[in-house]
Amino acid sequence: MLLTAAVSAVAISSVSAETLRWARAGDSLTLDPHAQNEGPTHTLAHQIYEPLIIRDMSGQFQAALATDWAPSPDDPNVWVFNLREGVTYHDGAAFTAEDVVFSIGRAQSENSNMKELLNSIVEVRAVDDLTVEMVTDGPNPILPSNLTNLFMMDSGWAEANGVVQVQDVEGGETTFAATNANGTGAYKLVSREPDVRTVLTQNENYWGIGQFPLEVTEIIYTPIQNAATRVAALLSGEVDFIQDVPVQDLDRVANTDGLIVKTAPQNRVIFFGMNMGAADIANDNVDGANPLADVRVRRAMNMAINRDAIQQVVMRGQSQPAGMIAPPFVNGWTAEMD
């Protein structure tokens, strides 16, 4: 297994610029905040919508739309969330506990790709405008973690625009929420052309102004799938910031005047999966047998993999050999098993 690094590159001139032209390999699949549980989709959504809880750069929990949260002292199956006062959506509507009740219920519905994260929640109650109780089917210490990508949606906006139900992505449905947005986040949606360009502008009424370094007033997000084209766009000045820099291009980008490469450990582990549970492997040339069911075969394959060579040659140093599927900054990691 390999723990990978997240790699990005930014033009020095963009640090003080009012507009940030940002590119990465893939576009958001939808703007519906509960339709897809997927990386690029969440990355864009986090600019527009907000969850109750976020993580800081070290992976620790940080208050967002909830200022504090804890199990009730009277019942460990009831979590109490106190909400941030004075928060408004981009259209000016107030954020309240009713929006939390609505958003959790919406995210638990059939078409939602987020529902598995909320399986333990059996009831959500608005105690008052700024207090919510979530009732679980048993003690659930990882509930805060499951809520860090669960975005809050304005129930009134959803009702007014016919998007109370989550977009049916698998069925090919297109809804108002798939191409429009009304969140509480730092940036507001200006325009959206899927797979072409998305333009955001800073939310002048954002509650987090002064707490977060909002250094640009406009974001122009352009998906560029081809890696070489993406790097060329950065080198030519067409964009200011790219994610997913190919490891083979890191030195060239880093040695270009005016560009900076940033790397950080990524919450991602690449591993070689083995089908050890099947009686027979369908695509091999041995009928009626599964050699991977034999632990000795699996151990032999484990010893045969040259992790250091993969790290140095394939990943160009942008990875770390791992002994378990959880990276060090994820709860559950232990040095003894890694």
Predicted regions and their residues:
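Bacterial N-terminal signal peptides
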Residues: L3-A11
